[in-house]
């Protein structure tokens, strides 16, 4: 059985169509056999890297992607799932779509660039979906990826019931699908938001814009020079002017809260300006007990204000929050089509159990079949802390051991928060919610700091293991309502809601490392029991009820799917069950973050959220471009 499974994989590679011409020299004789590249994981990093390598070296490489999950979990954390509910009133079924990972799309041009660089389809023949106003078709749309801007970008809801919308681009008329009445409605909402900013503190609107301008300078300099790893000296003057303004009160490497205290008086404005720090696994507040106020580990340096500019700046050409029509599953599907057009081979339900410089050991989903596949180069899209601890061999002579799957991770890193996710299907429309909503606790300065305690305390503080209900504690959370932008997410008159509540990561137990993977995962899932999940659900429902019309929300809840860190560990082998990966303190940022090339292996490269440059789909796409370049150089030198 094992030999037949290995033969099947080998034949899949050999049977792939080969292009006879290519634009780049590989420094090899034309009669040389193709070099085999194995990519572990069909996440965004794996798919993008595969497409870039194969499109650059079409005839001199065979690229094979091995994915442990089935076809339904293509894209790794970047994916969606459906819930089907029997419609007892009208017969038939109700279909709800939910996101399991990312729910907002940033740096749209990074997605476009991948399809422009590797695509083989004619954009002029693309289906533009339901957007009849869009006459300029893109390479991404040729592969079915349509991205619609969310305006406003966010609704921020405070625990006293105050709410404000932020993120209004100046060029609203250019946004897809907006009619003149819709534009006028948004203009009224924007004026209401400006008035609200000025109510929060004198000149609040101008202070807010001043903050976004500073953050835009950080973004314009940081993206090319520190994320894309390409020098752009033209951005440095504006960066330095903003950093040194007001006696260097906006210095980018100080704790984020220090800069916010210098700019704002209102706790609500400070909260609005810093909630994006959650995405990079950090709190905004200075930690007096740590060196540099905590910026080396758990406190966000002020430079991460660039995330606010990326999402909310009205005129910056990189700014804007978008939604992929059809959900983030469509992002992965479009990328798979891109790979297949470039003759990349993908094999699902296949787990890699060991990586060596010579190739990989693998096993089928039920572990009844497996073997060894040699490779000239291996690219690992599995989570770095998991891979280095569990599947990356320490010896080039490794025989693969038992060739059974395990789950463990390196807990020496600093991690982002874990997440308890509620995926709710409702029999009513939840009109009080925008596409993206952030609920923040700011009743007092103490509450504002305490609401981020899960990021400061980490493993020392489970969500409610202090015997105090979450309802009695300040906490922040995020709510996604996909149907506000994309009506296909829920049936007419219904809604799909995702709630993300930060929690502690899994606590590593070294004794579980030797157990079969399923047994270890089961024990880790027990760290988040039903009582804890129930407490979090009740706390969220209570906070949601502050919005008009949501006081009896549970009455129309018809289905619930709950994910905890144990779920994410099971589905995606992420270290600590943390969907956001490693945090981005200065000790794990840029050159101090795990790089693409592990020092112990010459023929292995890493790509993905926990490696350089960092987490989030656009950063992973940038990382994939950098890793593909390294891979091509390695292959050409062999």
Model-derived regions, located:
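A conserved FAD-binding loop/helix module that cradles the flavin
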Residues: 102, 609-632
